[in-house]
Curated annotation (Swiss-Prot):
It comes from the Bacteria. Required for maturation of urease via the functional incorporation of the urease nickel metallocenter. This is Urease accessory protein UreF 1. UreD, UreF and UreG form a complex that acts as a GTP-hydrolysis-dependent molecular chaperone, activating the urease apoprotein by helping to assemble the nickel containing metallocenter of UreC. The UreE protein probably delivers the nickel. It comes from Pseudomonas syringae pv. tomato (strain ATCC BAA-871 / DC3000). It holds the Pfam family UreF. HAMAP family: UreF (MF_01385). GO terms for molecular function: nickel cation binding.
Length: 243
């Protein structure tokens, strides 16, 4: 597949309009907001046609997204996405990678979220007729493998013909847009501030993609506040998101 075709596929897969199920998850952000742990924000003078003073939490949201990128996606999810991309024709290797994610993800809510989003993505690709999707769905339904998101991204996007670099871009951008979109729906920020955060985060994405990821045996994640928030999410009285 040529570069432009691969890039178009990456844009499609990373689009929030793509029905992959990721929009239902805040990955701990909702609990942090409810508990007042996201930060007080900064009072700034509003622009014309807005209130005189508004609360800007862009820095806090950007910090949350940066933490997820650096200490979870780059060192963990990206590792398994690339390993699955490389092993897309080897079902045994894919199920082993799936099992590693299951074992290394300590928070039950994160395991459930990764499985549910992964299986939602898989279901869409089965409906679209993506090569290899139906066969792997049979493995998931038979209970032979959990179907975690990074493994399915690597498998499915490889089978679509997406280039390795474009797969990583789609995954990183999709994570960022999902988190920032959650912040907007939680009333933490408006759409313009959300776009500023996404723009500000782009240099970090390119910086991380320039680094060699760890091997699956060395994969790790360390986002304690987010993980605790995810575990506490079910105790919230009002919940907009699944975690």
């Amino acid at each position: 597949m040529n570069t432009l075709s691969s890039l178009l596929l990456a844009l499609q897969q990373a689009d929030s309009f793509f029905p992959g199920g990721a929009v239902a998850w805040s990955w701990g952000l909702e609990t942090l907001v409810a508990d007042g742990r996201l930060g007080a924000g900064e009072r700034v003078t509003a622009r014309r046609r807005q209130r005189a003073v508004r609360l800007d939490r862009s820095a806090a949201v950007r910090g949350f997204v940066e933490g997820q990128l650096r200490h979870r996606w780059h060192s963990f999810d990206r590792v398994f996405l690339l390993a699955a991309w490389n092993a897309a024709d080897d079902v045994s290797a894919l199920t082993n990678l799936d099992a590693q994610i299951e074992a290394l993800t300590l928070a039950k809510e994160l395991r459930q979220g990764s499985r549910r989003v992964g299986q939602a993505l898989l279901g869409v690709h089965v409906a679209l007729g993506t090569p290899g999707a139906a066969a792997y769905q049979q493995q998931v339904r038979a209970g032979n493998t959990p179907g975690h998101l990074p493994v399915l991204q690597g498998l499915l996007w490889n089978r679509l013909g997406m280039h390795r670099e474009h797969c990583q871009l789609a995954a990183a951008h999709g994570l960022c847009t999902g988190l920032v979109s959650a912040a907007v729906r939680l009333g933490v920020m408006g759409h313009i501030d959300a776009q500023r955060v996404l723009t500000d985060i782009q240099p970090l994405i390119t910086e991380l993609l320039a680094l060699e990821p760890p091997e699956p045996e060395d994969a790790c994640g360390f986002t304690p506040m987010a993980e605790i928030a995810v575990m506490r999410h079910e105790t919230q009285d009002l919940r907009l998101f699944a975690n």
